Amino acid sequence: MKFTADAEDGTVDVIFEFSGVKTAGKKIVAFETLEYKGKEYAVHADINDNDQTVLIPKVSTTASDKNNGTHMSYAGKDVTIVDKVEVKNIVAGREYTLKGKVMDKKTGNPLLVDGKEITAEKTFKANGENETVELEFTFDASALKGTTTVVFENLYEGDRKSVV
């Protein structure tokens, strides 16, 4: 990127755009080189520089029936699905919100019970780079015999969605 300095000291924002899908769960470190008229004047290329490191979160999950601990549930009045969510590469000390939604696997649409989506969310403060969070979804599944469900999750930091 080219820029013209307006003072002896200053800063320039360098924007990196890329798909985060292939980088989920990785740490990315930015390196910069300052050149003038083809001559290199400064280089910042420290792979261990935490200030230049960006964590790309990754979410992996396992959903199970609360009563039997398996992936099979009964079409009963009060069913609870527990979604155990492992979140990797987040910043310790920051607050995150995990939001989940039960989906109908066949249609790809949100599962509706009495016309309402089945959702859950939990806000947590990260104690480290990796956390395990459980979301519970309790609903009337008595009319859902033969239905296969999946749980979708989104991780937010403030209003910004970090991971799908």
Locate the predicted segments by residue:
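Solvent-exposed serine/threonine-rich low-complexity stretches and specific carbohydrate-binding patches
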Residues: 1-8, 112-129
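Short solvent-exposed strand-capping/beta-turn motif centered on an Asx-Ser/Thr pair
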Residues: 88-93, 105
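Aromatic sugar-binding surface patches on proteins
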Residues: 4-17, 127-138
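Contiguous beta-strand segments within globular domains
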Residues: 70-84
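Short, solvent-exposed loop/edge segments of extracellular or virion-exposed proteins
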Residues: 60-71
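Conserved small/polar residues in nucleotide/adenosyl-binding loops
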Residues: 161-163
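Extracellular recognition modules
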Residues: 15, 29-35, 99-101, 150-154
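Short glycine/proline/serine/threonine-rich loop/turn segments at secondary-structure transition edges
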Residues: 20-30, 141-151
